[in-house]
Every structure is written in C-alpha cells, then in structure tokens.
Regions:
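A sensor for short, sequence-defined functional sites
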Residues: 22-669
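Positively charged n-region of N-terminal signal peptides that target proteins for export
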Residues: 1-5
Length: 669
C-alpha cells in the first residue's frame, strides 16, 4: 500500500534525524541483574526479558525494536539467535547493534553484518529474514540488541506482541499514526492511502487484548502507547487449544470502515466477488465438466466425480509449486481463474478448492464458498477487522436439498469429510441471501475410528511373536496419507514404527510390514505389523501380564498434572477399539483376569474393558470413546478423574498359571 504523499528535502532530513534520535540507547545493567541466577517472578524460567521497547512511526516510515534478556539456563542461550523477517523490495532492516554482558560485567559487542536469508517467494514478492547471533553467550549473560526497519514508501501499522514465550519484566510500546486518520479527525487533506484494491483508506482501527488494568493510551502528542510490567509467558501445556486469539497483543490497521459491521459487510461482499471471478464457468471448465459426468448422473454422482477429478490434480501445498520461468516454458500462466488451474493440472489448496466450486456450479449444482480460520491456529473473531485472519476455503453443496460440506483443497480428504482444522471453524460464507458469518459443523467420534487387532503367541517366559493390524478412518488416516505424499514408503514405515513405540509395552518391537489402502482416501487405511519381544513378569509358576497390551501414554500428563490453566483441546473426537488374543501353549491356563468394567464420564467419554477365556486362548477387548473436542479448565478435574480411572483399569494384571515346568515346556514335554 502506498501514499500519495511527497516529502520535501527538509522533511526527509528531519525524518532521518528523528529516526536516529529515536533509537533506544543501551542500558547499564544493575548489580542485581548481573548476579541473577534465577527469577522469583518466573520460577524455573530458562530466560526472562528485562526490558522490551517497540516504537513505530508511520508518517516517518520506520519502526525500532530493543530488548534486554537475562539468560538463566543452557536452553535460554537459544535467544542469542535473533531473526527479523521483512518484505524485500520495500523494507530494509538497518542499524543492527547488540552486545553480550557476562555476569562479571565484561562486554562483548556484536560485530559483522547479519545474514540475509530468503524465506519465501511468490511471484515478485520475496520475504527475507535477517539473522544475527549475539557473541560469547553464557548462562548468566545479559543479551542486549536493537534494530530498525525502514518501510520506504510503504506504511506498515504495527502488531505488538505483548505476551511472549518468556516472562517480561517491563515493556514500552509506542505508535505514531497518520493524524489525518485518527478518530475524530476531519477537514480537507491532500493525503490519502490506497489499500490493495485501490480503495481510499480513511480510518485507523485497533484491536487490543491487554492484561487486567492496562489500557491503550492516546497521548496528547498524537501517539498511542502501552506500558506493561510482569507479563506472564505464553502458556505451555499439553493439549492446549491454539491460543493466538487469546494472547495479550495490540493490532493497528488502516481501513475504510469504522466498525465491524460495516467492515465485514464490505469485505465479505468483495471476497465473494473475487471468489466468483476466480470460479468463473468458462468454456474450458464447461468442457472439462462435460467430459467427467454423464447426463444420467445424480447430483451426488456429479459431486463425487468432480471431487475425485480435482483431488487427483497436483496440490502444490504437498509437492512443489512451479516457478514463473517454468510456467513460461510450459506456456502456462499464474492461476487467475479456475480454468488456469485446470489447464496446469495443479494448484495450491485455495486454487483447487475454488476450481471445484467452478466445476460444481458448471455441473448445475448449488455450491457456495466458505472461508474459515484454521482451528490449528486460532478462532474467528469478527471484532478483529482483518480478512487475513481467514485461512482456508471449503465448498458447501446442496445435494437433493441437503447440505454437504466438502474440503477439496485438503489432499486425500474423502468426499463429505473435512480436516479437523476445518470442523467447528468460523468464518464467512456465500449464500443465496449474500455473504455472512458461519461456523462449520463439529465432528462426531464416529467420524474418526481406529481399530487395533492383535494375535499373539506367548510362552511361559513371556516371549511373544505375533501380528497386529491397525485400521483407521478419519483424521488419523488422513494424517498418514498426507505424510505419504511427502516421503517414500520406507521413510513412512520408519515414522509409523516410531509412533508404535508409544502404544506397545516396553520390551516389545513393532514393525510395519506393509500398508493397505494408503493411496485411496475412500478406503480403510490398514497397517500390517509384526510383533516380537517380551511382556509381563514370569516366575516358576505364574506369568503376570498387563491387562491392557496397548498403553495410552499420550494421556499420562492428565493423570500426573494436578492443575490446569488452559482448556484441553483433543483436536477431534474419536473412537478406539482394541482386541488382543493371546494363544496359550499347553501347560499354561488363565488363573485370574480383571472383571469386565466400564468407566464413564457422562456426556464426554467412556472406557470399556472385557476378557474372554477359552481353553487355549485369552482375548482382551478394550474401548475408549472420547466424544468431546474441548474441555474447559473447570472441567479438568472430571477429565483427570476419567483418565486416572482408565490408568487404574489398564494397570490391572492377567494371571496365567504354569502347570508344567518351563524347562519341560522348552523340551516339548
């Protein structure tokens, strides 16, 4: 975005002098800071921020950042590597300075220039990253650095990350915007801004989530500021929901709307027009659709055939996007319309989703686009007036009068299913009445099922050999199929074997022999696995085995962690069924087994355990259904109690009686 503002030479000189004087000077550390070995305000912390200062000035097109960090452990030394992302071609990272101060007061300055790395490139736009490493860092050191980003002819209103990965003692944030766009500003002005669509921008908007008792101050000098102290680090707990939407931060942006209602009415309408333009039903699309469907096809037949066709294309989010020169050599062009993606037989997830939208409409189906915030990243917040918070495009069909949500941009996702990231996700959607807010349906546990079926031969010493089949549908199957797109099958087997280590008992090796249904998203994915090793504890007369062959180690944190600050996010509900059959040799019989049991958590989850005894076999079946996705902190004790009861049930023992001496069995007597 550019300004129609021309600065005089004197203004340029003034700009340079103000920028130089705005740089924060390095501070003399106190004796307490130098000798600090731990921080009572942040027990166990690897490092803490002593100071942060971030100053942005849009009229002068610059921002500065300054930080002082106390390193308290070896891990804290990682903060000596500083990365500064920036947009090449318009922005410059300048005036980088830094130093390391040892606990004895010795100062080691930063020398040399930062490395300049290319992060990504799309078309003519390149994102770079300046990287520098503060020297001679030790546990106990203070790291101090600053840098400036010059915005050239662009403006870039700031986003302040008030809450960070480490405790912050004090921080100061300051932003000077264009006064012409301040609330209440009026009167004629020759200055204006254009957004990416060429529209005039006339309002400054901000979104703030601050610690209790703190507020964004508008100062008499025409700048905003926030001063904070003792900011806790970003929470870090197992199974946390994405918390980006809940962190302490402040975002500023210039927009043409003054309130959320006006903003989304305008932006959603423009988004819908852009979608329709890309998904235009051109001659190429109509001919392609005609070759894929038949006149006698039902609406569902058409929808499925077209879905299979776009899923078969090269999704460059899972492979590699062709460069501009490659497209030129192949006489292709950047995708601006659905027909471009079809001609290229490739596209990213967004392009493929909108290609499906175009083809569905061309086939006579009622189809609308919906764009949502990925649940792996955050939640949709209409009060945050920024269309960029939306991530992924889905397609909502009406088939025989019933709504069907599909996820064509999610490679290997079956028709009628969506990635867990897109279930229960909010955003905007098209409709016959025009665009508006919407939330996708949540998933059910029946959408995601795993069955483990093991057949095991065991001897009196607990040595086992056997086979295991793991059959999955839903999200776990989708995960492994997408992984198979990026690596070969040998590497996939290694990764799957690694995942098995978390569920089989210690002393047992599990190795994948082969997969079935790996390339067919509509099939059950099966992994055929060999088992060998030793389980249980053996004596001369008995063999003691764990009641549950498979362990739920992934949930042990719920058992051991007494308190919870954040919600528990399971990602998606699912059902797990297990059947383990032990084949017993002559001379071994079942002496004792746990009683059949159920552990319910009303409305949320249920656990079931059952044993079946036959003369030469013992079969243990186990089931866990988690019918919830999110548990609030006030529900944590109920959740913890459920998994404690599950752990107690799993830790029971199967008792096998040995009626013949092991030595005789070994000789076959």
């Amino acid at each position: 975005m550019r300004f129609s503002l021309v600065l005089s030479l004197s203004a340029i000189v003034l700009s340079i002098s103000i920028c130089a004087s705005s740089q924060t000077q390095f501070k003399q550390p106190t004796a307490d800071e130098l000798k600090m070995t731990s921080d009572p305000k942040a027990p166990g912390a690897d490092a803490v921020y002593l100071n942060i200062e971030e100053i942005s000035n849009d009229p002068l097109h610059y921002e500065t950042f300054y930080a002082r960090i106390k390193v308290l452990t070896e891990k804290g030394k990682d903060l000596a590597t500083v990365e500064v992302p920036y947009l090449r071609g318009g922005f410059k990272v300048t005036d980088v300075a830094g130093r390391t101060i040892h606990a004895d007061g010795q100062i080691i300055p930063l020398v040399g220039k930062p490395d300049d790395l290319l992060v990504s490139k799309k078309g003519d736009q390149e994102v770079g990253r300046k990287v520098f490493n503060l020297p001679s860092v030790e546990v106990g050191s203070i790291l101090e650095y600053r840098y400036q980003i010059d915005h050239g002819e662009y403006y870039s209103s700031p986003e302040w990350e008030i809450q960070r990965s480490y405790f912050v003692h004090t921080a100061h944030y300051q932003f000077t915007p264009f006064k012409e766009f301040m609330p209440g500003a009026h009167g004629p002005t020759s200055m204006y801004m254009l957004d990416g669509r060429g529209r005039r921008v006339n309002s400054l908007i901000w979104w703030a989530n601050l610690p209790e008792g703190k507020k964004l101050e508008l100062n008499a000098g025409g700048y905003f500021s926030v001063d904070v102290t003792d900011v806790p680090p970003i929470p870090d707990e197992d199974y946390m929901p994405p918390i980006d939407s809940f962190l302490y931060k402040v975002s500023f942006y210039y927009k043409s709307a003054a309130n959320a209602g006006d903003f989304w009415a305008t932006e959603a309408t423009q988004w819908s027009k852009d979608v329709d333009k890309f998904a235009e039903q051109s001659k190429t699309i109509r001919e392609a659709v005609a070759g894929l469907i038949a006149p006698a096809d039902t609406e569902e037949d058409k929808a499925r055939k077209l879905y299979a066709a776009v899923q078969a294309l090269d999704n460059t989010d899972y492979s590699r996007r062709k460069s501009g020169s490659e497209l030129k050599q192949l006489k292709l062009k950047e995708a601006r319309h659905a027909e471009d993606s079809w001609n290229q037989k490739s596209g990213d997830s967004e392009e493929i989703a909108m290609l499906y939208l175009a083809m569905a409409r061309s086939a006579g189906l009622t189809a609308y686009a919906m764009k949502v915030v990925s649940r792996s990243r955050g939640i949709f917040d209409p009060s945050y007036m920024n269309l960029d918070q939306l991530d992924d495009t889905l397609v909502l069909l009406s088939i025989d009068g019933k709504p069907v949500l599909v996820d064509p941009g999610e490679k290997m996702c079956p028709f009628g299913a969506v990635s867990w990231r897109h279930s229960g996700a909010g955003g905007v959607r098209q409709s016959a009445e025009g665009p508006g807010y919407a939330v996708t349906p949540p998933q059910a546990y029946s959408d995601n099922a795993t069955k483990r079926d093991a057949s095991i031969a065991i001897d009196v010493r607990g040595h086992i050999t056997g086979s295991l089949r793991i059959m999955t549908t839903g999200q776990r199957a989708l995960k492994w199929r997408q992984r198979a797109l990026r690596i070969d099958e040998a590497e996939l087997k290694k990764e799957y074997d690694k995942s098995l280590e978390a569920i089989v008992p210690d002393g047992v090796e599990a190795h994948v022999d082969h997969f079935l249904g790996l390339s067919d998203p509509n099939a059950i994915l099966m992994a055929v696995i060999s088992l060998k090793g030793t389980v249980g504890t053996s004596t001369s007369k008995r063999l003691l085995l764990p009641a549950a062959f498979f362990e739920s180690r992934q949930h042990t944190s719920f058992v051991s962690t007494e308190k919870r600050h954040e919600s528990v996010d399971m990602g998606y509900p699912e059902r797990l069924d297990e059947s383990v059959s032990y084949h017993l040799p002559e001379g071994i019989a079942v002496e004792g087994a746990p009683k059949d049991s159920q552990v319910p958590w009303q409305g949320h989850a249920i656990y079931g355990f059952k044993t079946t005894t036959q003369p030469e076999a013992l079969t243990v079946t186990r089931q866990i259904v988690t019918a919830f996705t999110l548990a609030k902190p006030q529900e944590y004790q109920d959740l913890r109690r459920f998994y404690q009861n599950v752990a107690t049930a799993d830790e029971q023992q199967l008792v096998l009686k040995i009626s013949t001496a092991p030595e005789q069995l070994a000789r076959g007597n």
